[in-house]
């Protein structure tokens, strides 16, 4: 719990700027906060450029960039082409990661509980309400699951992590698609539920509430040593979340088929694919108010694309393919006025 609270406390200022450091500002998704933090620390050592990133959720990041109060917004729920055009924004991905179900069931270790997408959806929609429900028990015949009510933990804020998670549930469950649907914020149907702000808040609540289940970006689960569930993927294989299964899900992605590269990576084919994989995105103005800071923002992410791969991989994020970063340099950043 102390580690989770430490992440929350650190979520506004990534490092303390030196007296002469230039500061670039961003706000939005909590999904990439751990890797942006590591990139910022390393980049400031090299350049003395300070990144002030507010980890406030994707919806907040979109609002902040549209209000022109930050140099960039960050979202895991990509904007569509028409919204980008209408807002005068460009969009590009920075890194890939996975969303994982996390649980707090006494005696259950990470990866021991196995769930299908359909059963996961039925839990979150409120059709399965106890852990020893036969539909869960049949998937886990060797586990002794408690006769205890399930508490759902979800995001309180508009969230790209929620967008990725509900996008997946909509892909694998007709019931979820018809009753709830996908979005950065949805009306959660389960009656026994607790809301948390940010990935940090969801992780903290799952750690606190016995017999609960929630969803977070994998780096939060790993950092806080939380128990995750294995998921059955589209090929019928049960897989663990890690950088290899996230990369497998993105292997066949057609990045250039959608404006702003806003593709969905959930429920992809492949025996090794993690089914709840997603990219996180940056939003910037084509004609920024502060051109100098916009160019420094570009330099920061360019440095990260070249030098930040190991830092990302250490946190089980997946760096973008070179073809994607090359296209970002040639087709996206060139649209931003200097």
PLM region spans:
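Generic N-terminal initiation segments characterized by hydrophobic and/or small/turn-forming residues
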Residues: 2, 11-12, 48
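Flexible loop/hinge segments at secondary-structure junctions
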Residues: 21-338
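Sec-dependent signal peptide recognition
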Residues: 2-8, 17
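Residues that act as N-cap/strand-start positions at coil-to-secondary-structure junctions
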Residues: 1-2, 86
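C-terminal segment of classical bacterial N-terminal signal peptides
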Residues: 12-20
């Amino acid at each position: 719990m102390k580690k989770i609270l430490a992440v929350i406390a650190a979520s506004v200022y990534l490092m303390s700027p030196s007296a002469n450091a230039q500061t670039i500002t961003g706000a939005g998704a909590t999904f990439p906060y751990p890797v942006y933090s590591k990139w910022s620390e390393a980049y400031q050592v090299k350049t003395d450029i300070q990144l002030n990133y507010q980890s406030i959720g994707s919806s907040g990041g979109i609002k902040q960039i549209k209000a022109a109060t930050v140099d960039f917004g960050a979202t895991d729920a990509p904007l569509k082409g028409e919204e980008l055009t209408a807002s005068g924004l460009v969009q590009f991905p920075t890194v890939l990661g996975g969303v994982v179900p996390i649980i707090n069931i006494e005696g259950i270790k990470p990866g021991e509980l196995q769930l299908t997408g359909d059963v996961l959806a039925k839990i979150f929609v409120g059709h399965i309400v106890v852990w020893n429900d036969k539909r869960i028990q049949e998937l886990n015949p060797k586990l002794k699951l408690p006769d205890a009510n399930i508490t759902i933990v979800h995001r309180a804020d508009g969230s790209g992590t929620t967008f990725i998670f509900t996008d997946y549930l909509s892909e694998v469950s007709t019931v979820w698609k018809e009753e709830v649907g996908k979005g950065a914020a949805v009306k959660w149907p389960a009656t026994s539920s607790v809301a948390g702000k940010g990935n940090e808040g969801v992780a903290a609540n799952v750690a606190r509430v016995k017999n609960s289940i929630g969803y977070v970006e994998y780096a939060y689960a790993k950092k806080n040593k939380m128990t995750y569930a294995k998921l059955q993927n589209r090929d019928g294989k049960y897989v663990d979340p890690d950088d290899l299964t996230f990369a497998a899900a993105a292997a066949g992605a057609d990045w250039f088929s959608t404006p702003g590269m806003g593709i969905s990576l959930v429920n992809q084919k492949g025996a090794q694919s993690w089914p709840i994989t997603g990219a996180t995105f940056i939003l910037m103005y084509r004609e920024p108010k502060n051109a100098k800071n916009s160019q420094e923002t570009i330099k920061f992410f360019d440095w990260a694309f070249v030098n930040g791969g190991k830092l990302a991989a250490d946190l089980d994020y997946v760096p973008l393919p070179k073809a994607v970063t090359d296209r970002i340099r040639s087709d996206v950043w060139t649209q931003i006025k200097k």
